[in-house]
Design a protein with these regions (language model features):
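Solvent-exposed helix/loop surface patches that form functional interfaces
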Residues: 35, 89-175, 227-228
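Contiguous hydrophobic, core-forming segments of folded domains
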Residues: 62-130, 183-196, 200-212
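Acidic, glycine-enriched loop/beta-strand segments at the rims
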Residues: 166, 239-241, 256-269, 282, ...
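Extracellular/periplasmic ectodomains of large secreted or surface enzymes and adhesion receptors
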Residues: 212-253, 286, 294, 388, ...
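Histidine-rich, glycine-flanked metal-binding segment
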Residues: 256, 261-302
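Divalent metal-dependent hydrolysis catalytic cores, especially in the metallo-beta-lactamase
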Residues: 317-337, 352-360, 389-402, 411, ...
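Active-site neighborhoods of metal-dependent hydrolases
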Residues: 384-402, 440, 448-592, 658, ...
Length: 676
């Protein structure tokens, strides 16, 4: 499961406004507040120096950071320093200083200096969530409500809601604010209602509650209130960006991609009514009048794309739709929160793709990922399967700490309910064991290739599941009997592979280098996002290790192509930044020797087939749901053209990716094809 701690984009760094030698303590709770996962301790010394001790661990990984800084009279950093380790072990060492009208900074990813006039706040790359306190307090002192940022950008915020919390009989007032100017979407936080406000709680609904110690019991109520406030913001986005298609809609002169055959046809007319395709005819021949007309102008019309490995958050919807993703499979989430998102999407109130849920089941351990159900025995595992079946989930996803002894019984039980079973490989097993025990699908290329690297003592609940493939895949002989026998096993069992190649780009990214996963879109995103994409999360000790990790990643791509050519089904998933990552994933399939048309087939037909919605969508034909995308260029010849989405139709609504992109601070990739 992906981490929500993306330092430098959603959050800033450090804190302020506590009395001398006073420590404010925060506790980090996950999975709806049910489990403790870390802490944040903030102390202001008598000399004006503030220190922050931050540690967070979930899913066997997480950052450990120590910050120290001093503030100027305007509440912004004069000096700042953070050290520690990132989510997967990369060193963090970043410093900043202001001397009059000049500032300079240096981190493991970048360095710079620039002149500055007046108030401006430095935004660290490696900071903690606590920096919201500095930003909010500094913003509160700004008459214009805007705070210039270093190296670039401007921060602003507005109040969304008020609440009362209590501790030991004493009550206090807090408020929810939405902070904009960093990243693609607002960051929401609960802050104190003081002359100098500070962070009270940072809540990521369904996953994290970072809340002041002693107020843990208020976390659930604050999370519920935050969901209501965010629902209003998201509903306003949907109302602004969705274009209703009442009555009939005619798409003229579109070249239809046949996702079942992976071929591109001649220009056609497509007539839509009540979210369904009611007829397809030769281009220019449809004579019936329609309430809405879309002139495709010979562009390619594809079924909406499927992202088969997402962990949906409500602000992800715009990025998905702008990239042509109209359906996602959620591979692990807080169950209550995900059910709410699904209901909002189905009601038309949420800017989002369709969500097909996979039920997350983890085993209880110190390294467990806290989401879905965390079980200890067979009875609890069966209860989880029952709950997911009763709520319409077509499959379950098993995770790292799942008890290996009960795996055959649980897969058999899920199959008896008509459900598919997929997941990571439980610790102390190999992929071939999981397949023989009933897995229908395996998530992630590292989980596949660990089959040849682990022994009965390898703890894949830790970051070893990343470092071992990075070190060893480079030396694997894919033509060896062991590897060929494993490929034959996957073919024989018709095992589906969800490789998520793009998300593993991090194993070969050195600090300071732009992530190759996003280099093709970097010029389109805000500068702070570009800067963050230069941050490496992997500890790469020297040039020799970098060369090994690079070769290992290239061989992961190669192995994906070998599996496909052997007849092993693939689905296209991401487990990373919504939208952009799926487009890069398809490029990597082509790099693996898969044709562009076949890559598009994987992202459409295969997605619908293995999400079990092929009877509803995934193919452009009469009777199917009108989930469609118009693309400039020809992605069946040049897969990079898949980024040029000019129009998205999702049932009874149309979306212009250019409008969504502009709302998110992204430079559009194509001119819109508008509905007349």
């Amino acid at each position: 499961m992906k981490s929500i701690f993306v330092f430098g984009i959603g959050l800033l760094a450090a804190t302020a406004n506590v009395s001398a030698d006073e420590t404010v303590r925060y506790v980090a709770l996950v999975n709806g507040g049910s489990a403790k996962a870390g802490h944040q301790w903030v102390t202001k010394g008598s000399d004006g120096t503030t220190t922050v001790d931050f540690d967070f661990k979930d899913n066997g990984r997480g950052p450990t950071l120590k910050e120290e800084y001093k503030l100027g009279a305007d509440g912004t950093f004069v000096t700042y320093h953070v050290t520690g380790t990132s989510e997967i072990g990369a060193p963090v060492d970043e410093s900043f200083a202001r001397e009059g009208d000049k500032v300079h900074w240096k981190s493991t990813s970048d360095k710079g200096e620039q002149p500055v006039q007046g108030t401006a706040l430095y935004t660290p790359l490696g900071g903690t969530p606590q920096g919201l306190s500095v930003a909010i307090a500094a913003l509160a002192n700004r008459v214009d409500g805007k705070l210039p940022l270093i190296p670039s950008g401007t921060l602003s915020f507005r109040k969304l809601a008020d609440a009362e919390v209590s501790n030991g009989g004493a009550t206090r007032q807090v408020q929810l604010v939405a902070i904009t100017g960093i990243g693609f979407t607002p960051t929401t936080a609960w802050v104190t209602k003081d002359a100098s406000p500070r962070l009270f709680a940072f809540i990521f609904p369904g996953f994290l509650q970072l809340i002041e110690e002693g107020y843990e019991k208020d976390g659930a109520a604050l999370e519920t209130q935050q969901k209501v406030a965010e629902k209003k913001l998201l509903g306003a986005m949907q109302e602004r960006l969705a274009h209703p298609l009442a009555g009939t809609t005619l798409i003229r002169n579109a070249r239809i991609f046949d996702s079942e055959k992976a071929t591109l046809g001649a220009a056609s007319d497509v007539l839509i009514e009540n979210s369904r395709i009611i007829s397809i005819s030769d281009g220019g021949t449809e004579k019936r009048k329609a309430a809405h007309v879309i002139d495709a102008g010979g562009r390619v019309l594809l079924p909406g794309l499927f992202d088969m490995h997402a962990h949906f958050g409500p602000w992800d919807g715009g990025l998905h739709l702008a990239a042509g993703v109209t359906s996602i499979r959620d591979m692990g989430n807080n169950n209550e929160t995900l059910q709410q998102f699904i209901a909002q999407e189905q009601s038309g109130a949420l800017l989002a793709p369709h969500v097909i849920p996979a039920g997350f089941i983890e085993g209880d351990s110190p390294n467990a990922a806290q989401g879905g159900f965390v079980i200890k025995n067979l009875d609890e595992a069966k209860h989880a399967v029952d709950w997911y079946h009763e709520h319409g989930y077509p499959q379950v996803k098993i995770y790292n700490s799942f008890p290996k002894a009960i795996l055959p019984d649980v897969t058999a039980y899920a199959h008896s309910k008509g459900m598919r079973v997929s997941g990571h490989i439980p610790v102390f097993l190999r992929a071939q064991d999981a397949v023989e025990d009933g897995y229908d699908e395996i998530q992630h290329i590292n989980q596949v290739l660990l089959n040849f690297l682990v022994d009965d003592k390898t703890d894949t609940r830790t970051p070893e599941r990343f470092y071992l493939p990075a070190e060893k895949v480079a030396g694997l002989d894919f033509d060896s009997k062991q590897v060929q026998d494993f490929i034959a096993l996957l073919v024989r069992h018709k095992t589906v592979i969800d490789p998520t190649l793009t998300t593993f780009d991090f194993i070969r990214q050195r600090d300071g280098d732009m992530s190759q996963a996003y280099i093709a879109v970097a010029d389109h995103v805000p500068p702070d996002v570009q800067r963050n994409w230069h941050v490496g999360t992997m500890k790469i000790p020297d040039d020799a290790a970098y060369a090994r990790y690079q070769k290992s990643y290239e061989k992961m791509i190669d192995f994906t192509g070998r599996m496909y050519k052997a007849g092993i089904p693939l689905v296209a998933g991401t487990d990373a930044v919504a939208g952009f990552t799926l487009q890069r994933e398809l490029e990597l399939y082509v790099q693996a020797g898969i044709t562009p048309a076949q890559a598009l087939q994987i992202a459409t037909y295969n997605g619908a087939k293995y999400a079990r919605v092929l009877d509803d969508r995934g193919v452009i034909m009469q009777g199917k749901r009108a989930d469609l995308i118009l693309v400039d260029g020809d992605p069946t010849k040049d897969i990079a053209d898949i980024r040029k989405v000019a129009l998205v139709v999702k049932g009874d609504k149309a979306y212009y990716p250019s409008e969504i992109d502009e709302a998110l601070g992204i430079k559009p990739f194509a001119q819109p094809v508008t509905v007349k």
